[in-house]
A protein has these predicted regions:
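Conserved catalytic alpha/beta core of Sir2/sirtuin-type deacylases, generalized to analogous enzyme cores
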Residues: 2-347
């Protein structure tokens, strides 16, 4: 039997040999052909993969340069930030970080992330605040593991900027952003409100939260880090005297987070909303960069869709989107858009 010379014939022969059911004596030359063919095929794939990677890298760098120029040329920058930006900064609600601070709760109740645990119907307010005081402290009063927000500030600190965010972790202010140029639409881990609510005020919770975590056995280090005891087991409840109640009606206090119609939009919330509206009004028709960072589709009506609409209504505006996935825009905006998929921390 002659050895086929044409490449397609070689493929057919080798595939046939690889599917043989009954053992046969194989000509060593066939094995050599198989080896040569597989090597050539792998080499082709590697070359193609490298070419695609190089093309992707060049396009990515071109977009990053385009974004840099858009920031430099902008009369104003409107930052719209979602949960993905804090994830990039290291504020993750699963995995090692969850196990470190909530391993006892996970072992008792079976939930696997902080977010799910926040909805658990604990039997007592003492245990509820045992969980939530840890949740608040590590996500609001501890610094983010990575300097993503600080790096972002360096990009825009010389610009006329405003921040619109659905995040509730206070990372922008901790990084040094001007608090008068921010609008936290969905609340703040650092604020409590009446659970009814009987009135529209919010209350700073830092001192009480620190007492709650310390009562469970934690120590607050000089740098603000929460340290677990070396030998003693952590408590999962707080003393009853630390459970906060409304100073006006006596109802239990709760988080100032937008979950339903009971969310309190206090005086500070309305003032921030007015400042944001005024900023947008003052920059109509100007070179505005709408910079969307880590925004998904849970609440697209707050940042994503308005940014699209305002860009479409202003031919001088630029819409930029950085997201780990789904960095995209409507076809109508492609000539005004810069969409980059990736982790903001690595750009």
């Amino acid at each position: 039997m002659s050895i086929p010379r044409e490449r397609e014939d070689q493929k057919l022969l080798l595939r046939g040999l690889m599917n043989v059911r009954v053992p046969k004596k194989i000509n060593p030359r066939f094995l050599q052909i198989q080896d040569e063919y597989l090597r050539a095929e792998m080499e082709e794939k590697n070359i193609l993969f490298k070419e695609k990677n190089q093309l992707f890298y060049r396009r990515r760098m071109a977009k990053i340069q385009q974004l840099k120029e858009a920031i430099e040329e902008a009369d104003a920058v409107v930052i719209g930030a979602g949960a993905g930006l804090s994830t990039s900064a290291g504020f993750v609600y699963t995995g090692e970080r969850f196990s470190k601070y909530f391993g006892d709760f996970a072992g008792k109740y079976g939930f696997e992330d902080m977010y799910s645990g926040g909805f658990y119907p604990f039997d007592s307010l003492e245990e509820y605040w045992g969980y939530w005081s840890r949740y608040i402290y590590i996500n609001r009063y501890m610094n983010a593991p990575k300097p993503v927000y600080e790096n972002l500030l360096r990009l825009v600190q010389e610009k006329d900027y405003f921040v619109l965010t659905t995040n509730v972790d206070h990372c922008f202010q901790k990084a040094g952003f001007d608090k008068h140029r921010m609008f936290y639409t969905q609340g703040d881990y650092g604020l409590w409100q009446c659970s009814r609510p009987c009135h529209h005020e919010t209350y700073d919770n830092r001192k009480i939260v620190e007492k709650m975590v310390e009562a469970q056995g934690y120590t607050v280090a000089a740098d603000g880090t929460l340290l677990a005891p070396q030998r003693a087991a952590l408590k999962m409840t707080v003393p009853s005297e630390l459970v906060s109640h409304c100073p006006k009606c006596g109802a239990p206090m709760t988080m100032n987070l937008r979950a339903d119609s009971t969310f309190v939009e206090d005086d500070g919330w309305h003032k921030a909303a007015s400042r944001y509206d005024d900023f947008i009004r003052r920059h109509q028709g100007m070179k505005v960069l709408f910079l969307e960072l880590g925004v998904g589709y849970n609440t697209p009506g707050i940042i994503k869709y308005p940014f699209w609409q305002m860009t479409a209504g202003n031919p001088k505006a630029v819409y930029a989107c950085i997201n780990y996935r789904d960095a995209a825009c409507p076809t109508e905006l492609q000539n005004q858009a810069i969409c980059i998929e990736g982790d903001f921390e690595r750009l």
